[in-house]
Amino acid sequence: MARQDETDCKKLDSNSAFLPLCITSYRSKDEAEKLVSCLHHEGSYFLCFSYGLYTGTSNELKAKVEFALDGPFVVNYATVPMFMSASFCHLLMFNDGSIKGFKCENNKFEIIYDSNVAPKLDTISLLTSSWLNASFEGVLYTCNKNISYDSDLHTLCTTIYSFDFREGIVERFYATDGEEIISFDFISREDLLDDATCTGKSHVYFLCLLKSCYSENLFLKEYNLAGKHGSRKFDLNEYRQYNLLPICDNEFCYMKVVCGHTIVVLTTNYTQIINIKASGLTNGAFFNNKGLPNVENYQFLKDSYDVIYERSVILLTISDVYANKYTAKIHTRSLHRDHVLKELQWTKERVFKPPKHDLCDVILQLPREKYIAVTRINGVNFISKDHRGSKLEKVKSGPAYTNKVYLASQVIGNKGTDIDSLLLGGSFNSRRGFLEKKILVYDKTLFKLVTSSKALVENVTDFWVTDLALNGGDEFAYESGGLIYKNGIFLMDEPYDYGLFVSRTGKVLKAGMDGSTGEFRQVDFLQSNHNSSTMFCYPVQNSKLRISILEAKSGFLRKKEEFFIHGLNSKESIVSCFSDGAEKYLFVIYLDGVFSVWNANQKKVATSHPDYSFIAYDQLIKISWLSKKHKHDSIYVIASSYTGCVRVYKSESNFLRVDLEIHSLYDQKLELLDTIPSLPLVFLYNDKEIILLNLQNMSYGCIQLGLVPRRMRIRPGKALFSLCVLDYDSRISIFEFGSTFYREGFTKQMTSLKPQLENHIFYLPSIPVELYTVPNNLNQAVVCLVDSNSRQYKLMLFNYASMKAVSTFSFSDEKYLHAVVKPLWPEQNSIYLSQRPFYGNKFVVCLGVGEKRTKFWLFEIRNNNITQLYANYLEDCIFSVFIYYECNLVLFSGDSGIAAYKINMLKEGAEILEAYSFPALSSINHIGLPAYMSGDYLVQFEILRDFLRTRFPIRTSIVYPSEYPECPYLGFKRLGSITQVATKIIPKKLREPKNDCLASDKNYLLGRLSDLSCATLKYSNRSYVATIGIDNTLTIYEDSKLSVDKGGLAMPYLKIRLPNKIISLAAIPDGFQNLQICPNFNSQRLEGVIPLFLLCGTEGQIYIISEFIGELWMRTLHDYKKIKLECKRAFRRSEKSMRNVTKQYSVSKETGINESGFDELARNSKRRHIDHSPYKTIDFFDPVKLKR
């Protein structure tokens, strides 16, 4: 569905158009590792997670095999005895259809089977899909209980597939119609009868326990198979059915065949024994369970059911999430036909005491009172029991694992160009919640501490590396009290004001020396022997800008070069230099808001657009590391301002464009520290944070050194470099960088050098259900918490920089059905918004919704406190609230319609909440889906009626114009099949003034980033609505005439089913143009996009929906589709293909969205809507595939 302004893009055919949307997913290792299954075999435990298989006998692993986090994940774990050459094979099935088989011998896993050509088993596989497996005579039978839910028919159509690995055949073996498969198994007749008359008949029984999707009926079906191995066929049309007692939807049920002749069916309420005879199934015994918790939705562990037949005793075991184990014994001698005992006594035993609020996901019993327990907070643990009690130990080198649910999410507004951090709220269980901050951090092993020592003088405020000084001794010179020391001797015996530098040879350079009008700037260059040499450049007072280059020798300074640039004021300029040590010099000069790059021939190489909102105080210039001859190098200018902002300018032709903007988390000035010329690394730091910037891939992240830096210096060396850090205790610590790196091919290593997501968690005794980051407030967020037991709510002001609660406010003791919290502040900053009557104040609107009436609160965030300004009751059951910031207007939508109120917080003598009457409100559907203001119109979206516009002239009372007239703030209760709704406005931007550096036909972003000229936006002033359906379908609509078909029905811009249960859907604030946290994107950030929506949910997965912008992406999309259509056959592989009776399966080797955790989302580059022929769209594009 093309927009009008996209018609200039080329199309491959007239029946399709490109949809420039992409989806990226984010998971740290602990969130990615979802437990698939586990088992105990021959004294060892085996734990299968999404990205690895682990085995051991104690708290130390014996062997493990792990898979790449950005590749396909394991969805099913099965074991097959006598598999090919192995006596026991561990089969792992992946979400992309591939299968790997391993045998475990001599404490290591060895792969014995690998196929990439298995079927995808109908549809998407979830990370936590529930699989059933059974093997018989080398054939694996498997089904996914979760994957075939039909949202239209509301039925489960589960399918069992058979995998014959000897013949290479995959067949659809068995399928249900409106029935859920509880369990299935196979029984050979030889197991039943020790009778010579049965020899050669080889009868096999297929037993399947089913539950109706339409009722609570539970029944067991028996199918018979006859024939020799390899030619057996089940007659699935003929079966015998045995009706069992019904079970509730939320009641657990388990079936196991023991010793080949007895079936045990275990439910919450009863246990039934069924005997298998040659003539059929006969009832053995029936028991009512006594001692098992009979509570609705009680949480038993699904993999903890176990039935063992020993010495005429059937031993039953089951465990729950609270680490309790329940056991019962049945003596088979007391069983006979139709025998019914009233009760089966279960005994309860505490395996171990979990930490407070922690719950178990797995309890696996090992021999001799030993267990493996996987808990939601503490991960994988080994438990041993003796007479003194239980001992819990963390399994060493085990998988990182947490099981948490995300309930709310926000992108942290960092004032920069890239999304680099997230704030999320969620829970581990119904009582334990958490707030989690995700930030980018480099691995701690990147810097190795070599030495740390106290300086020879006290109160050191600065230092310099002087390791080349002839007099030897201490390799540092220190500044203390305005004096310079080395080895306890004065290097300079008079105080200085600014501009001091000490060279590596111990020579002191200071401002004013040799006529300098600015600070001396160090210029490092790499010599042919890999040693680093140093020069200094500085501006000299003159009618023209004169730049002198000094080279520091052992006892003197030698003037090496001198350059003159006309028309620039040397006194007001900041000058920095780059040199390759021989033939090339480049100078960057900052003057009057403009950065300009000059060469040694006084020729201007590149210049930036004037920007007076960014005032630089320090700068660096570097050149890319692609060409030794410097013919096609990019020039990078890194500049820092006093407000904590750092910009990276990159040359394009003769223009310097802003490629990246980073802000200090604490709004403090960031010092710049270059490394060595051969490395694309720059440090940004202050006394609260250290950031490492990698210009090779434009990534950045925090460095954790375990100290507070006061000043940092670089000491070049043959092993790359060392980082020298002075702290506030006058101690200097030396860290060696990249000791594991090698010099040859170092550029490739720098490309892959990228920080990883790290989680910082703040634990809560209640559950966070809503959160909003406070704009322009130092690292604070407003969080709504609920106690799941008392149903009482409270607000919390949270500092996500320090990860501490700042202030809380408890609502009244009344119980509410739910609460609605909405912020009353603008998402953007502009000169127009700053003229508002209470600009800068942060207000929060809260509603406590009861059965008959709703309580209204108005709070203000003031002086790090939540202050209540107003509270009153609204005599209606309110289920949504709309906040229009421009007019301080609040619309309440409830059972009685829509009511409007004006908030008068600064109007003396007036009610804070003043009722307003608007006739247009009577025509508005008060239970509609999301709304937002566009000019004088209130726009609502209804799936069956498209975007409805109602004239709502409330802007006439506005004194000040708005740069951002559309502001969506509307919260809803669940309506029909829609569970989540969010609205995203792409505001109309202003055109930049023309200048000699910009093409005249380009539009550039203005606003809080002043311009950030890297983004070309042709598609502005748009509105998107995103919804999540009950079947986990993400649907995105666009406010456009093209979004309606010929019949007037609103057509989705995109519709796709996601592989996780989505709980939180939020619009992302404006201003971002790139995604820094993009781990699946070839170690590069995703640039040139507009982030639209943030989604998260039950499986710890986070999604960001973005829109591609710029002509580069449009051309890439065009080329991608053309290549895909022309080369589709070339990507196919048919090696060792498994045959299906109706379909030939093969799996493409190309990588794409499957790497991000999706299955079958990128199979076709175009998707058509069957019911509406005019509707055409395509799937989400994976930026990884497009880049390739």
Swiss-Prot record:
It is found in: Membrane. The chain crosses the membrane at residues 73-93, 878-898, 1089-1109. It is a multi-pass membrane protein. Keywords: Membrane, Transmembrane, Transmembrane helix. GO terms for cellular component: cytoplasm; membrane; nucleus. This is Uncharacterized protein YEL025C. It comes from Saccharomyces cerevisiae (strain ATCC 204508 / S288c).
